[in-house]
């Protein structure tokens, strides 16, 4: 199974596995100087809760790329992003 959104792709190792391979969206600078967003290197063999934590951390980092934030701001954003991910199943109801 594959779970994919705009900023990540998670692929289950096998149908009965609890482990996932994860690709996160990364900003890369090409040799010609253009900047592109593309899925980065694969992180192998993560349980689903670790996949979610890495997605949240990546989203926070991308949203605050060129600025410093406080620990409180980081934790507030962490909570908001985790709620968004956790509530995806509720959005269809």
Residue spans of the language-model regions?
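Short, charged/polar N-terminal "headpieces" of proteins
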Residues: 1-19
């Amino acid at each position: 199974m594959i779970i994919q959104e705009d900023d990540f792709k998670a692929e289950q190792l096998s149908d009965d596995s609890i482990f996932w391979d994860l690709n996160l969206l990364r900003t890369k600078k090409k040799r010609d100087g253009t900047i592109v967003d593309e899925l980065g290197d694969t992180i192998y063999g993560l349980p689903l809760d670790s996949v979610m934590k890495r997605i949240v951390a990546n989203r926070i980092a991308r949203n605050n790329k060129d600025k410093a934030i406080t620990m409180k701001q980081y934790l507030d954003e962490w909570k908001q992003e985790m709620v968004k991910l956790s509530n995806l199943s509720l959005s269809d109801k």
